[in-house]
Amino acid sequence: MKQKYSKKSKKWIYITTIIFILILDISSKRLIIKYIKTYDTKKIFSVLNFFHVHNHGAAFSFLSDQNGWQKWFLSTVSILTILVMTRIITKLKKQETKKITAYSLIIAGATGNLIDRIFYGFVVDFIDIHINDWHFATFNIADCSIFIGIIILMRINYST
């Protein structure tokens, strides 16, 4: 009896993590849309700006210069990623918490960016990290979630 409760509570931890990241991602993007005009910048710290930009492509604006087909392609890739990662999680042993966490983070990020593509036709990016005049690619919380999930998976795969 106790083991079933433990297994269910662990599932809820991962589901709650996904929901929390989605709420954080969607809320932050809505605030950016509401308070910062497109292509405007708000300085937060010396190395951090909020720069409101619309990304019609993938990471690093890959495919953003295409004529619209990329929205459907990237949405399909996101849906397949979410489905595959969910299937992988259901096949993992409950003791593989690091892998489940990593896949949950990737699912949350892919879902956040998919929601943007469906509702806006693009992904809202706003986190601008820079040193003087050098700026890293602008990103969002969903991108951070995907990145952290990938880093966790890489550490798991390369530490054994």
UniProtKB/Swiss-Prot annotation:
Parts of the chain that traverse the membrane: 13-33, 72-92, 104-124, 134-154
Keyword match Membrane: yes
Annotated InterPro entries: Peptidase_A8
A Gene Ontology cellular-component term: plasma membrane
Pfam families named in the record: Peptidase_A8
GO MF terms, alphabetically ordered: aspartic-type endopeptidase activity
UniProt GO BP: proteolysis
Taxonomy, superkingdom: Bacteria
Active site residues according to the UniProt entry: D125, D143
Family, similarity comment: Belongs to the peptidase A8 family.
Role according to the record: This protein specifically catalyzes the removal of signal peptides from prolipoproteins.
Protein name (record): Lipoprotein signal peptidase
Organism: Buchnera aphidicola subsp. Acyrthosiphon pisum (strain APS)
Gene: lspA
